[in-house]
């Protein structure tokens, strides 16, 4: 009888604890979401601060001021200044990629407009960020992270090409290198405002793309 009482008590206790345990798990999950959202906000503010003032011209105080809190608070989110630079660059430049590809044409008739407008738009919107990215990823301290980032870029643009394939009627294996040419020309223009280089690349694309579309219509 005593064993049965112990058993019933343990069942009752377990049922009393379950809601609290679930509530604790939910609270931890929410806290983690809040932490991650704040970290992303900090990464954007720090990256923008670096983009405005340069990698070498920006100290920890300037970063903390941009975020609106103390220098020590930065280390709530990052183990070191190097970690902040590495994580912020990867996060913010992936967002730039998304911004860029959100403007990708979904109709063949829109491709010419895309070629004409987007290089100038991204130079205006993202030029400082591109320059900072190259400053960071060509630095000996960060170059391995740059290699890893650009491997990811290649994979992501391939995925974009797969998404565009049914909309444009061009196989992704053909579309991917065309995207690479266009992105490289756009980024080069954003970095150096080299109009001659940009137009020479766009001329090739504007001649090639209609031929490619016509080929795969058949």
Residue ranges and their predicted role:
Residues 1-37, 218:
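N-terminal intrinsically disordered/low-complexity leader segments
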Residues 41, 45, 49-83, 87:
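Helix-turn-helix
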Residues 87, 100-125, 172, 176-179, ...:
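Hydrophobic alpha-helical connector segments
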Residues 97, 141-169, 173-177, 203, ...:
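Amphipathic alpha-helical packing segments from all-alpha helical-bundle domains
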Residues 120-159, 192:
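Short secondary-structure transition hinges
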Residues 121, 135, 176-199, 210-218:
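Amphipathic C-terminal alpha-helical segment
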């Amino acid at each position: 009888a005593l064993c049965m009482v112990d058993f019933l008590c343990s069942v009752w206790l377990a049922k009393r604890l379950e809601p609290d345990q679930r509530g604790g798990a939910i609270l931890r999950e929410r806290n983690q979401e809040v932490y991650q959202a704040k970290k992303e906000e900090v990464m954007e503010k720090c990256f923008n601060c670096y983009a405005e003032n340069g990698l070498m011209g920006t100290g920890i105080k300037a970063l903390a001021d941009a975020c609106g809190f103390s220098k020590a608070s930065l280390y709530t989110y990052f183990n070191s200044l190097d970690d902040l630079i590495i994580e912020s660059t990867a996060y913010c430049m992936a967002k730039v990629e998304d911004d860029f590809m959100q403007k990708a044409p979904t109709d063949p008739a829109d491709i010419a407009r895309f070629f004409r407008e987007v290089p100038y738009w991204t130079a205006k919107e993202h030029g400082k960020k591109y320059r900072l990215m190259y400053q960071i990823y060509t630095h000996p301290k960060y170059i391995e992270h740059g290699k890893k980032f650009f491997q990811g870029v290649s994979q992501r643009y391939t995925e974009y090409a797969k998404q565009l394939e049914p909309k444009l009627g061009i196989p992704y294996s053909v579309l991917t290198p065309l995207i690479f040419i266009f992105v490289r020309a756009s980024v080069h223009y954003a970095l150096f405002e080299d109009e001659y280089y940009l137009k020479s690349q766009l001329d090739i694309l504007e001649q090639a793309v209609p031929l490619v579309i016509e080929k795969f219509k058949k």
